[in-house]
């Protein structure tokens, strides 16, 4: 029975090495060595990896364990000590390098960095490469060059108790990053509410007709001024760049009437512009005519003055002759005056020695010749005098009429 148990291998020491029995003597061979070797190789292939051995090998590579001489591999791996004094400095050095590298950051050109140290405002950093202690500082980048735009709209009550729908946009940008982040909870939302409040205040102090027609620029300027006064008290770090009054619409019930009123005002402005253009066109012409008349008047004045001076000079030259022969000079002046007066006047020459008592003047010929030589505007429409015909048989002798002569008397 014992022999059978020995052959089956049931009496082996369970703590011995695989393939070695308790009764095996050195130098003795067993009949079942080949079977035991095959069985041992199968057990080694099916057993899980040794976790302790893997951990000890890792410690050896890190320098935490030393191999003892004169011992087997299994016993040396199980008894290797763990040296924390060498592992901790290495881990601290690696962690410090990672911590330092992780602290580098970059701020863009259009941004400013707000540094918080343990949650408290510390400083403002400029664009470029910067460094912060990780887990100590926190950096919040804020764009200070971007122009932002917000839009507000709604139905508002005017001064004359009418409703009007208005729309306005505000362009702004960040001026102080720290105040923008920490002065109020939300600076953008606060600006939106301030814009709505300023717009309602301005609309409430204007009539609906002014808002829809000529008061658009007034609404824009007053809203901008009121908005700056509101945000100044909050000190939000924002700068309002521009305010644009987009549109204003009346309620749908009265929209047609307001459209007609606006069209009439536009026509009025158009007529005014056309009248101003006509005035600008005619004004230079009128100024030119006025200048021409002034120059003609000046020339006429100079001519009259010169003529008068010449006449005075002529009379002064005749004065010695008048003193020497007054009668002769008087007759000469009379003749010259009559020449001027009678030069363009029709004349009839009569013979005074004729004893005929009846003299018939050819008035029709005289008047006809005068109408031909006179200007068309002269009053010449009166009928010529016709001598009444005599009823008696008296035949007058033909009258000799001297030819008409113009010019100087002989």
Swiss-Prot record:
Keyword list, A-Z: Membrane, Transmembrane, Transmembrane helix
Membrane topology note: Single-pass membrane protein
Principal cellular location given in the protein's record: membrane
Bias-annotated ranges (Polar residues): 374-400
Keyword Transmembrane helix: yes
SMART domains tied to this protein: PHB
SUPFAM superfamilies attached to this UniProt entry: Band 7/SPFH domain
TM segment ranges: 87-107
Localisation per UniProt entry: Membrane
Disulfide bridge positions per record: none
UniProt-listed InterPro entries: Band7/mec-2_domain, Band_7, Band_7/SPFH_dom_sf, HflK, Stomatin_HflK_fam
Region (Disordered): 1-49, 374-410
GO cellular component, one term: membrane
Biased composition (Low complexity): 19-47
NCBIfam families noted in UniProt: hflK
Family named by the database record: Belongs to the band 7/mec-2 family. HflK subfamily.
Job description of the protein: HflC and HflK could encode or regulate a protease.
Assembly and binders: HflC and HflK may interact to form a multimeric complex.
Protein name: Protein HflK
Organism encoding this protein: Haemophilus influenzae (strain ATCC 51907 / DSM 11121 / KW20 / Rd)
């Amino acid at each position: 029975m014992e022999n059978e148990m020995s052959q089956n291998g049931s009496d082996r020491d369970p703590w011995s090495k695989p393939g070695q029995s308790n009764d095996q003597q050195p130098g003795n061979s067993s009949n079942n060595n080949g079977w035991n070797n095959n069985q041992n190789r199968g057990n080694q292939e099916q057993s899980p990896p040794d976790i302790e051995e893997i951990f000890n090998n890792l410690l050896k590579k890190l320098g935490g364990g030393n191999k003892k001489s004169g011992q087997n591999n299994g016993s040396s791996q199980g008894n290797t000590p763990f040296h924390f004094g060498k592992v901790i400095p290495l881990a601290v050095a690696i962690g410090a390098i990672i911590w330092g590298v992780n602290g580098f950051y970059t701020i863009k050109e259009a941004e400013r960095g707000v540094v918080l140290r343990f949650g408290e405002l510390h400083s403002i950093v400029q664009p470029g490469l910067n460094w912060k202690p990780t887990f100590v500082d926190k950096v919040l980048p804020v764009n200070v060059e971007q122009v932002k735009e917000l839009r507000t709209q709604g139905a508002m009550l005017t001064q004359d108790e009418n409703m009007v729908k208005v729309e306005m946009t505000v362009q702004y940008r960040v001026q102080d990053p720290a105040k923008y982040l920490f002065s109020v909870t939300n600076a953008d939302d606060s600006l939106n509410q301030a814009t709505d409040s300023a717009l309602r205040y301005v609309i409430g102090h204007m009539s609906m007709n002014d808002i829809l027609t000529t008061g658009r620029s007034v609404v824009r300027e007053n809203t901008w001024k009121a908005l700056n006064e509101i945000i100044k008290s909050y000190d939000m770090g924002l700068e309002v760049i521009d305010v644009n009054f987009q549109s204003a619409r009346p309620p749908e019930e009265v929209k047609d009437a307001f459209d007609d009123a606006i069209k009439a005002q536009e026509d009025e402005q158009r007529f005014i512009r056309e009248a101003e253009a006509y005035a600008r066109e005619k004004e230079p012409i009128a100024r030119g005519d006025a200048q021409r008349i002034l120059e003609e008047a000046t020339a006429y004045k100079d001519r009259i003055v010169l003529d008068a001076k010449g006449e005075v000079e002529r009379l002064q030259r005749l004065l010695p002759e008048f003193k020497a022969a007054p009668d002769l000079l008087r007759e000469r002046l009379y003749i010259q005056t009559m020449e001027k007066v009678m030069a363009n006047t029709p004349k009839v020459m009569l013979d005074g020695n004729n004893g005929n008592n009846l003299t018939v003047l050819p008035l029709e010929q005289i008047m006809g010749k005068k109408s031909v030589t006179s200007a068309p505007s002269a009053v010449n429409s009166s009928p010529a005098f016709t001598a009444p015909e005599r009823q008696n048989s008296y035949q007058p002798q033909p009258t000799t009429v001297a030819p008409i002569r113009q010019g100087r008397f002989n």
